[in-house]
Amino acid sequence: MVKKFSFITIIISILIVLQFDKVDAESMSTKDAKVYFIAPSDGQTVHNPVKIVFGISGMKILPAGINEEHSGHHHLLIDLPVLPNLNQPIPSDKQHMHFGKGQTETIINLTEGEHTLQLLFADYIHIPHKPPLFSDKIKIIVKDHND
């Protein structure tokens, strides 16, 4: 009986400590932070492979998995009509490209035609900051090298 009581007391104590030791899991962005494209520019006609250069100010770029205040890494959103859920980790597929090593540029191939691009900056576990940091959406036109 005493062992059972002691075990229950320990468990309750741990739960109480954990409850009071909760840390706000939301990663905050700075007031002056801004995410933007350095290249290409909105409306630009490009050829494959397409070089895309990311810009950010007011935040620190770090690889995924490193939890530091006011930091994160870029995600490139391709041809998305709306932003993904900003309270969940950003999906990883061909329309949601992760740059979790802290990259600030990429070279990709896109099909010919018009495409939209948007940047979304997120924390160490791919969840957008509060408030979220996303670029303006830009349109580019990909042409064949023979055009």
Predicted regions and their residues:
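Bacterial N-terminal signal peptides
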Residues: 8-17
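Short, compositionally biased P/S/T/A/G/V-rich stretches that sit at domain boundaries
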Residues: 26-47, 147
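Contiguous beta-strand segments within globular domains
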Residues: 44-59
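Short, well-structured beta-strand segments within conserved domains
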Residues: 50-54, 104, 113-121
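Short amphipathic, basic-aromatic surface patches that mediate peripheral association
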Residues: 55-66, 127
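Short coil-to-beta strand junction motifs in C2/discoidin
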Residues: 66-74, 134
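A beta-strand/beta-hairpin structural motif
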Residues: 87-106
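Internal, hydrophobic beta-strand segments that form the core of beta-sheet-rich folds
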Residues: 111-126, 134-140
